[in-house]
From Swiss-Prot:
Protein name stated in the entry: Phosphopantetheine adenylyltransferase
GO CC list: cytoplasm
Origin species: Leptospira interrogans serogroup Icterohaemorrhagiae serovar Lai (strain 56601)
Gene name for this UniProt entry: coaD
Cofactor entry: Mg(2+)
Annotated site (Transition state stabilizer): 18
Length: 160
């Protein structure tokens, strides 16, 4: 049986913390789908096309990886593509409380889908897309927290 996992998120923007979780996930599963959530009720800095472009560029050459977008519930997307696992990265205990509650609901909705929690590597444990955007808005360098293509796009977008 193939083990297919999805790694869902808005990835607005993609961070080095996301990439850390992704690379480690690729060692655990036969295939991982980065599933970019499209939520019309959520305001994003980067369009879905921009986020897809960043992820495609940064993950070029990674084996066992697919990139897709989805709307609706994560477990419905899992069932649609035949995934049996959802990957979630955890930075701190506060992340766990929130993610654990969601994983319990997901289990009720789709008993066949497991949530796999991966702790962030220490050097990425403080990084979040929200914090990166806030720091960049104030003109500070975020190149240690995001891939180069994202850092350049942030500078360009926030200087407009």
């Amino acid at each position: 049986m193939k083990h297919l996992a999805i790694y869902p998120g808005s990835f607005d923007p993609l961070t080095k913390g996301h990439l850390d979780i992704l690379q480690r996930s690729l060692g655990l599963f036969d295939k991982v789908i980065i599933a970019i959530a499209v939520n019309s009720n959520k305001s994003t800095l980067f369009s879905i096309e921009e986020r897809l472009g960043f992820i495609r560029e940064v993950t070029k050459g990674m084996k066992g990886l697919e990139i897709d977008t989805f709307q609706g519930l994560t477990v419905d997307y899992c069932n649609k593509v035949g995934a049996n696992s959802i990957i979630r990265g955890l930075r701190a205990v506060t992340d766990f409380d929130y993610e654990y509650a969601i994983s319990l609901m997901n289990k009720k909705l789709a008993p066949n889908v497991e949530t796999v929690f991966l702790m962030s590597s220490g050097e990425y444990s403080f990084i979040s897309s929200t914090i990166v955007k806030e720091v960049a808005r104030h003109g500070r360098d975020v190149s240690n927290q995001v891939p180069e293509i994202v850092s350049k796009a942030l500078l360009k977008k926030l200087s407009q």
